[in-house]
């Protein structure tokens, strides 16, 4: 079976564990099972001081539709980069995601809903393609397009290059670019280039080391921020509770690239079905059969 042979490759099994355990937004966007995530967070950065944040994200599979339609609500993952490198304000949304073609390599969907910050309706497609590069390499390309009723467009383009180093170490190089019409004159094409080294300690814990550069192209091209971070994530004895400790150092253009140490503490409450899918689509990180 072509699906099983692809998913059973060592690099794909490692990618599934990394994406599911560390809750990669692109991985989560492809899951049609019902789930709720609650994330109280605390941030401290030397130049900005301390602040708290509460993130809510829900996905409800609509019954009798064969996992083809989901209601999504809460923080919009497409509004900014990951929190470890981008602390922009969350944008709340409510919408419906309609799933199209889904294979081991292809995933397509179409989402329509409303953004509350701008109070605008939006709609647009999402397409993902991934494949292996030899026995220990793979890539994933994702393109999302949105049109809003305030006549703004949004384009998100992401490329992941993955490499399995050993049974415990996994490397990913990410290029993530975002163009938003409402911010086009101030930011242009905002881009994050990140290197991630994941160290799998056990089935329940892991480190993710990161170096990221964020830059934009308007009104001129320059770097907004450099970030070095070490993210420790662990599942507790309760399968529905995770915690994270993320010390980091950044050099921000806003503060003249001064040395800016900080830390992020997060609890995550997870309710609902696991982010796993059938074997040909993926396996859960907490199944007995899942191994790199």
Report residues per predicted region.
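Flexible, glycine-rich linker and terminal segments associated
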Residues: 1-20, 264-292
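Outer-membrane pore/translocation modules
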Residues: 64-194, 199-213, 217-226, 235-241, ...
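Outer-membrane beta-barrel initiation region
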Residues: 1-104, 114-122
